[in-house]
A protein has these predicted regions:
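N-terminal, post-signal-peptide region of Sec/Tat-exported proteins
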Residues: 64-97
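N-terminal secretory signal peptides that target proteins for export/translocation
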Residues: 1-20
Length: 691
């Protein structure tokens, strides 16, 4: 079982800037109001220019910027052209957050500011404008316009000023131009410069967006030490970003320990001024969501789901909780439930990009392909720079593009069906999606075995058509014989239907029965019409029950019927490690046993099964995992009695990047056939390219 693809919040985006942003705007307005206050507000205002300037500088030096600005404005009312007061006013406005107004006044100074100081003002103004554009864009359909306009000023990188460079990095990060922000940070480091403390978090966000968690971690750690909290509601919490960086760097234990401490330290409720009812602490909620995400990304889906269900019960009006709950439900194999949850999330926040991306992922999983492209284009039209949007586009293009699969199995032993040595290869090349519902594909099958009677091989090459609908998949294919040892054209068809999140039904039919007819029967030109059906009930990733049945009508008159039932149950889960146990039982019967291939008149078996799976390495789409499958039981054949049977298989899977995966495995099987024990060793290789 592979973990679900990560669904991580864009760390460059601060918390919703609703009431907090309005308070910031109110503070700025108050600053300007105090700056223009009448001199009566300060009854001991000095009468001379030098005294007023000295008072302004003294207030500035002690950190009383509003009072300093009021004194400065009083001086300028009397001496409007005073150069020192004009320059001090620019500096005070910039420090109070009125960066745009400060820049306007700086450009009106009779004596221009030095280039480094002007560059710093330009970068500061750009950072403020980008922040406002990110939190409250004037046009939600074009959220980058204001930020890009703010960044259109000359690049201050040529000026050796760390403050100006840092402000521009902040503006770039908030304008969703994280690549440029990360590049500017690397250039600053090469020059031997350091970031001011206030820039650590936004620059770390940009580095994390560019998948450089090792570079982001020191900045997040420095920001967390410099300001351990509490944080304003509209300000991003660097401790949350640090947990994301730990997780993306593969340090999942550090991520869990850190975020659990953060969540425990945050109060659930904050006092609400003017109200007796407290308000929810958004940073507490975000920490709890991140704690659930850490568990989800390390395969502990049930624990994550339970945490999110509890959070939703406490905060049913929080769209972020609904959204992440849907992501966890999809990871547990419940896409329809996830879709319903996303509808609720969209009702709470219809403009949230991640909610729309979650719906797109759900439709892709359900095979509801016609809805994917229009929805994705609509999102791209608004936020094309969003890293999660870009990843969604790449994943969809891979899924709807060319697909190639190669499987090769090789075995050695003394089986009556397989001979001393056998091998089978199947390769499939599927076209891109046609009309969002169809694929045409080419398929080849090559199988051969060294039997006591001699060498035999079965070779086919053909075409197929596969169709998709919501929760439904069907195929039909024709594989003419190749070579002089294969007879007839194989016609095959099948379907797979998922009516809900729990049941899966499959049906496969073939007029040659290549999957069921052993190569020993093929040596004697025997084929079969075969029908295989199955029904599976899967509660979640933790348990499933499957019942399958087959009916084969051989060309030599033999009739074979069989069934098999399998139950699997999760026994243990740890980070990137799982243990499953189960039981398997089945039976088969044949109308003829006087045939040249293994055909018992009746046989029954029961076995205990186990599977251990472990992720050895994971970094974004790159992963390396291994798996061990074991089974042991009893095989009872009519007229020959019972004997033990066992099998073991060890395999690894390596995905060097998204859309490409290699697999290999080695297995061993021991089972009695007609009272004689057969031991067989197998090697299997797989390759997948596409999605």
């Amino acid at each position: 079982m592979s973990p679900a693809a990560p669904s991580q919040r864009d760390r460059s985006v601060p918390a919703k800037a609703g009431a907090g942003a309005r308070r910031t705007a109110l503070a700025a307005a108050l600053a300007l109001a105090l700056a223009t206050a009448s001199p009566q507000a300060f009854p001991q205002t000095p009468a001379t220019r030098d005294a007023l300037l000295a008072q302004a500088r003294q207030q500035h030096g002690t950190g009383h910027r509003l009072e300093a600005l009021a004194a400065c404005e009083d001086l300028l009312r009397r001496w409007p052209a005073d150069a020192d007061a004009l320059r001090l006013r620019v500096r005070l406005l910039a420090e109070l957050g009125a960066a745009v107004r400060a820049l306007e006044l700086a450009r009106q100074l009779p004596t221009p500011l030095p280039a480094p100081e002007l560059a710093r003002l330009e970068a500061d103004a750009a950072a403020h404008q980008a922040r406002w554009a990110q939190a409250m864009p004037a046009d939600t359909r074009h959220p980058y316009v204001e930020a890009d306009r703010a960044l259109a000023s000359p690049d201050p990188a040529a000026v050796d000023d760390a403050i100006a460079a840092a402000d521009r990095m902040i503006a770039l990060a908030r304008a969703s131009r994280s690549r440029e922000a990360a590049g500017a940070y690397q250039a600053l480091r090469r020059r031997g410069g350091t970031l001011p403390a206030y820039a650590d978090t936004p620059v770390a966000d940009a580095l994390l967006q560019q998948r450089q968690p090792e570079q982001a971690i020191p900045l997040y750690e420095a920001a967390s030490r410099a300001q351990p909290g509490p944080y304003p509601e509209e300000e991003a919490d660097p401790r949350i970003g640090l947990a994301h960086a730990y997780l993306e760097a593969g340090r999942h234990r550090d991520a869990q320990q850190w975020i659990d401490r953060v969540a425990a330290s945050e109060p659930a409720w904050l006092p609400a001024p003017g109200s007796v009812r407290p308000r929810a602490n958004p940073h507490k909620t975000e920490a709890e969501l991140t704690a659930a995400l850490v568990r989800q990304q390390t395969w502990r889906y049930r624990e994550a789901w339970r945490r999110l269900e509890a959070l939703r019960a406490e905060g049913p009006a929080n769209a972020s909780i609904w959204n992440q709950l849907a992501d966890t439900e999809r990871a547990r194999g419940w896409p329809r439930r996830a879709e319903d949850t996303l509808v609720g999330a969209a009702g709470l926040d219809p403009d949230d990009t991640s909610i729309r991306l979650g719906a797109i992922d759900t439709w892709r999983e359900l095979g509801d392909f016609p809805r994917v492209e229009p929805a994705l284009r609509e999102v791209e039209a608004v936020v094309p720079r969003d890293p999660q949007v870009q990843l969604a586009r790449q994943a969809w293009d891979r899924q709807r593009g060319w697909q190639f699969d190669l499987e090769h199995d090789r075995g050695r032993g003394g089986s009556p069906n397989f001979g001393d040595a056998d091998h089978e290869t199947q390769a499939t090349l599927q076209s891109p999606l046609l009309g969002e519902r169809w694929r045409i594909y080419g398929i080849t099958r090559l199988a051969a075995a060294n039997l006591p009677e001699g060498h035999t091989q079965r070779e086919r090459l053909g075409l197929g058509l596969r169709g998709y609908a919501r929760g439904f998949e069907a195929y039909v294919q024709a594989l003419p014989a190749v070579g002089n040892q294969t007879r007839r054209t194989a016609l095959e068809a099948g379907l797979r239907w998922l009516p809900d999140d729990y049941w899966t039904y499959t049906l496969d039919w073939s007029n040659t029965g290549d999957a069921d007819v052993p190569l020993r029967a093929h040596y004697y030109d025997i084929t079969a019409h075969s029908l295989n059906v199955s029904a599976q009930w899967r509660a979640s990733e933790r348990s499933a029950i499957k019942l399958s049945a087959n009916a084969d009508r051989y060309s030599d008159g033999n009739r074979r019927h069989g069934w098999e039932a399998a139950w699997t149950q999760r026994a243990y889960t740890a980070p990137w490690f799982s243990v499953d146990g189960g039981l398997q039982a089945g039976a088969t019967s044949n109308s003829r046993s006087d045939v040249p291939y293994y055909s018992p008149s009746c046989a029954r078996w029961i076995a205990a099964t186990g599977r251990l799976e472990n992720m050895l390495y994971e970094r974004y789409e790159r992963s390396w995992s291994h798996q061990l499958d074991l089974s042991f039981g009893s095989y009872d054949e009519c007229r020959y009695g019972s004997g033990w049977m066992a099998s073991a298989h060890y395999g690894q899977r390596w995905a060097p990047h998204a859309g490409l995966a290699f697999g290999w495995g080695i297995g061993w099987n021991s089972q009695p056939y007609d009272g004689k024990r057969d031991n067989r060793v197998m090697l299997d290789l797989t390759l997948h390219w596409g999605e």
